[in-house]
UniProtKB/Swiss-Prot annotation:
InterPro entries for this protein: Papain-like_cys_pep_sf, Peptidase_C12_UCH, Peptidase_C12_UCH_sf, UCH_C
Subcellular compartments: Cytoplasm; Nucleus; Chromosome
Upper taxonomic lineage: Eukaryota, Metazoa, Chordata, Craniata, Vertebrata
GO biological processes: cell differentiation; heterochromatin formation; monoubiquitinated protein deubiquitination; negative regulation of DNA-templated transcription; protein deubiquitination; protein K48-linked deubiquitination; regulation of cell cycle; regulation of cell growth
Domain ULD: 652-680
Entry protein name: Ubiquitin carboxyl-terminal hydrolase BAP1
Region (Interaction with BRCA1): 578-703
Ranges of Low complexity composition bias in the record: 269-278, 563-579
Coiled coil: 612-643
UniProt short sequence motif Non-classical PY-nuclear localization signal (PY-NLS), positions renumbered to this chain: 699-706
Organism from which the protein derives: Bos taurus
Positions bearing the site annotation: Transition state stabilizer: Q85
Length: 711
């Protein structure tokens, strides 16, 4: 019974004619090009063609794999038409029969009606034998198949169409008794995908299942809306950092403002003993980075001048204490100041208070963008350095260890146990970041910092940044970072890549606040960080709200599953006001849970978080933004490929072929090519097949005398 079934091509016209040959009336097969669009008109089932990944021999065997979605109840399985495929090359007919014989309102015709009545209550194996023993089905099937060649050349440059089609398989998706079933003749049981929603049709459920199977499920996510929500949340986290510093240390703002008004920055030596010792870092760095054109002058906290950084670790540029500035001899032991009592035993508040003073004293200063921006890399070694810093932060005289000589840290120490903060621009980074993000939330945000009176500022955009390596320039974008929540691809190898940037905002702020990226600010800090654990699951699906008291909480979703961009009212005056307006969600995107995270309870209560926790959350938001940017870019490229393939498929090549053949004939080359092609076919084609047929009986005749002699 398994002889003579041929391969069928995946063509809707072929399937429609085959259905008519079965005797079915009022049914046609159409090809689907867009799984995101709803299907128009009544749909009886889906036929899905996919590549069969197992060996060719195993296609004749029914897979015995069973999972939790397999229906093993004999009553349910026998009451539907589900047949095991026991015949090779019959999967197309099996797929059509699985759809047609499970429909109650289709005119099946005499052949299929008789088949349905005869196999009622049969097991899947018995139904498979019934299909194989139906000559009407085999005849209709083979009438639309391409005839197999009687011979195959010994050498072929490529696979034939028949051999290529043998690697593909047809399965059906059919609604049966309110549930979606996947009927695959090569599986021992049907697969139950469950019921569909009350407000949707069964085709919506089937399209989702098929999209998940072929890896296009993410196409349903509105990446633009997710990116918008993430960038608004990034702005909110930056506001929370700014507000936390403003609330915790308000007295330092007026202190430093008065200091800046009394003494200009350029006249202060490197060994200045001011209470905050901010000018210690500004003078050397500003003097070293000054250019004649007055455009590129770098503050102490700005990550500029990549030639001072190793390729894989763009550090903050701080001039070593052994250099002369404006003729003033350097002081080998600068005075350091102690942190406030409530922050003295923590490592997460090294300089944000001093940065607030810069903000208060530097509002309204001119900001000149820099031409060569800096590239940031995701380097794990930064975390190791920070772990070394944490191990030494318990002593009163805090020393910050570095891996190599000539790499001064953001802090310097002396014998009197005072702490000198050398990074003065954290709040300016936050404030300018917020200001830029309010202008356009749909483009990558930029950092702008100002170092103080009399010195220009530097703008570090987050896009189009060169590699830290001076010799080459990277074309990678920030979208290549893995997601903080749903990307398992993060590894030390990827992180050590100098062309793979991390968030410029998070990298810079964390280095300003903590010296370097803290060990708890890794992307894999979900299990250890409270802010990431609480807000991580909803960071891309809902907006965050920052209260006046510093409480950060997610807003309740009013309308979920719309897939449209949320409408918000952005906060105003984020630079000068510590109480931004509330953000309200009109429409929220689909809130799908991310793997590896536990969704918090429905009643989400806001909490206050430390600067370290907020920076960890900020880094995760940046990584999630980069992940969605990569996905969006991938979808755009995929659409381009779809259009190219469609144009290639629908293009009429006949005119080109006729023109080419005419040109060959005009040049007198056509006759020679035809003759050569005929001679090749004679050597490798029909003659070889005939010789094989004649050699087989000859070999048997020759082998018998040899066997007789041996006996």
């Amino acid at each position: 019974m398994n002889k003579g079934w041929l391969e069928l091509e995946s063509d809707p016209g072929l399937f429609t004619l085959l259905v008519e040959d079965f005797g079915v009336k009022g049914v046609q097969v159409e090809e689907i090009y867009d799984l995101q669009s709803k299907c128009q008109g009544p749909v009886y089932g889906f036929i899905f063609l996919f590549k069969w990944i197992e060996e060719r021999r195993s296609r004749r065997k029914v897979s015995t794999l069973v999972d939790d979605t397999s229906v093993i109840d004999d009553d349910i399985v026998n009451n539907m038409f589900f047949a095991h495929q026991l015949i090779p090359n019959s999967c197309a007919t099996h797929a059509l029969l699985s759809v047609l014989l499970n429909c109650s309102n289709v005119d099946l015709g005499p052949t299929l009606s008789r088949m349905k009545d005869f196999t009622k209550g049969f097991s899947p194996e018995s139904k498979g034998y019934a299909i194989g023993n139906a000559p009407e089905l085999a005849k209709a099937h083979n009438s639309h198949a391409r005839p197999e060649p009687r011979h195959l050349p010994e050498k072929q440059n490529g696979l034939s169409a028949v051999r290529t089609m043998e690697a593909f398989h047809f399965v059906s998706y059919v609604p049966i008794t309110g549930r979606l079933f996947e009927l695959d003749g090569l599986k021992v049981y049907p697969i139950d995908h469950g019921p569909w929603g009350e407000d949707e049709e069964w085709t919506d459920k089937a399209r989702r299942v098929i999209m998940e199977r072929i890896g296009l499920a993410t196409a349903g996510i509105k990446y633009e809306a997710r990116l918008h929500v993430l960038k608004v949340n990034r702005q909110t986290v930056l506001e929370a950092l700014q507000q936390l510093i403003r609330v915790t240390q308000p007295e330092l703002i007026q202190t430093h403002k008065s200091q800046e008004s009394q003494l200009p920055e350029e006249s202060k030596p490197a060994s200045s003993k001011s209470p905050l010792a901010l000018e210690t870092s500004r003078a050397p760095v500003a003097s070293e980075s000054t250019h004649t054109d007055g455009v590129e002058e770098v503050a102490g906290s700005c990550p500029q001048a990549p030639t001072h950084s190793p390729p894989s670790k763009p550090k903050l540029v701080v001039k070593p204490p052994g250099s002369n500035i404006n003729g003033v001899p350097p002081n080998p032991t600068p005075i350091v100041q102690r942190l406030p009592a409530f922050l003295d035993n923590h490592n997460y508040a090294k300089s944000p208070m001093q940065e607030e003073e810069d903000l208060a004293a530097g509002v309204g200063r001119s900001r000149v963008p820099v031409r060569p921006p800096q590239q940031y890399s995701d380097d794990e070694d930064d975390y190791e350095d920070e772990e070394e810093d944490d191990a030494q932060s318990t002593s009163s005289a805090i020393r910050y260890k570095r891996k190599g000589p000539g790499k001064p840290g953001p802090l310097s120490s002396s014998g009197d146990g005072q702490l000198s903060v050398l990074q003065p621009n954290t709040i300016n980074v936050l404030a300018e970041k917020l200001k830029e993000s309010q202008k356009d939330l749909s483009i990558p945000l930029s950092i702008k910092t100002s170092s103080g009176a009399g010195s220009p500022a530097v703008a570090v955009p987050t896009h189009s940044q060169p590699s830290p390596t001076p010799s080459n320039e990277s074309t990678d974008t920030a979208s290549e970072i893995g997601s903080a929540f749903n990307s398992p691809l993060r590894s030390p190898i990827r992180s050590a890549n100098p062309t793979r940037p991390s968030s410029p905002v998070t990298s810079h702020i964390s280095k300003v606040l903590f010296g370097e990226d803290d060990s708890l600010l890794r992307v894999d800090c979900i299990r250890y960080n409270r802010a990431v654990r609480d807000l991580g699951p909803v960071i891309s699906t809902g907006l965050l709200h920052l209260a006046e008291d510093g409480v950060l909480s997610p807003l309740a979703l009013t309308e979920s599953g719309k897939g449209s961009s949320p409408s918000i009212r952005p906060s105003q005056g984020s630079q000068g006001s510590g109480s931004p307006e509330e953000k309200e969600v009109v429409e929220a995107v689909d809130s799908r849970e991310k793997p590896g995270l536990v969704r918090p309870s429905e009643s989400l209560n806001g909490e206050k978080y430390s600067p370290k926790e907020l920076l960890a959350l900020l880094k995760c938001v940046e990584a999630e933004i980069a992940n969605y940017e990569a996905c969006l870019k991938e979808e755009v490229e995929k659409r381009k490929k779809f259009k190219i393939d469609d144009q290639r498929r629908t293009h009429n090549y006949d005119e080109f072929i006729c023109t080419f053949i005419s040109m060959l004939a005009q040049e007198g080359m056509l006759a020679n090519l035809v003759e050569q092609n005929i001679s090749v076919r004679r050597r490798q084609g029909v003659s070889i097949g005939r010789l094989h047929k004649q050699r087989k009986p000859d070999r048997r005749k020759r082998s018998r005398p040899y066997k007789a002699k041996r006996q």
